[in-house]
């Protein structure tokens, strides 16, 4: 769910309850982002802040990961376990990969296949938009 979006940033929320099989869910779809005032399309997202909760299970499987989508194998941005808040704005955010391979530049929420059924994952993330 997009909570707020403008030319500079987008804030996205996702709530995922595991069914025990693992999942990859598109979290930040750059092709669905609004164009800026000059008509340019968003090409990449830079993680600025994240609020998260990865709870439930026996403790060994209650984690999630944000990845940048790539046909050659997804590129991890950050791992999330427990609950908390991180602010990366002081140094410009966690930049995603912008190499010349087959990046699609979408950001995915990945829940491991070892997750117990009913584990809950909530992530609210603020991204800077790059054009």
Predicted regions and their residues:
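C-terminal interaction-tip segments
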Residues: 1-8, 112-131
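Solvent-exposed loop and beta-edge segments used for protein-protein assembly and interaction
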Residues: 4-6, 41-46, 101-103, 117
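Short, surface-exposed beta-strand/strand-loop-strand elements in extracellular ectodomains
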Residues: 56-80
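Solvent-exposed, flexible loop/coil segments flanking beta-strands in beta-rich domains
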Residues: 1-39
């Amino acid at each position: 769910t997009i909570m707020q979006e403008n030319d500079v940033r987008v804030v996205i929320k996702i709530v995922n309850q595991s069914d025990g099989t693992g999942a990859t869910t598109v979290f930040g779809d750059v092709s669905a982002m609004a164009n800026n005032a000059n008509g340019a399309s968003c090409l990449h997202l830079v993680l600025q802040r994240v609020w998260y909760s990865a709870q439930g299970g026996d403790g060994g499987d209650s984690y999630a990961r944000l990845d940048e989508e790539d046909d050659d194998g997804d590129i991890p941005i950050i791992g999330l376990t427990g609950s908390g808040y991180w602010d990366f704005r002081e140094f410009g955010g966690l930049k995603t990969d912008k190499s010349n391979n087959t990046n699609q530049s979408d950001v995915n929420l990945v829940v491991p296949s070892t997750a117990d059924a009913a584990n809950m994952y909530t992530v609210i993330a603020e991204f800077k938009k790059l054009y």
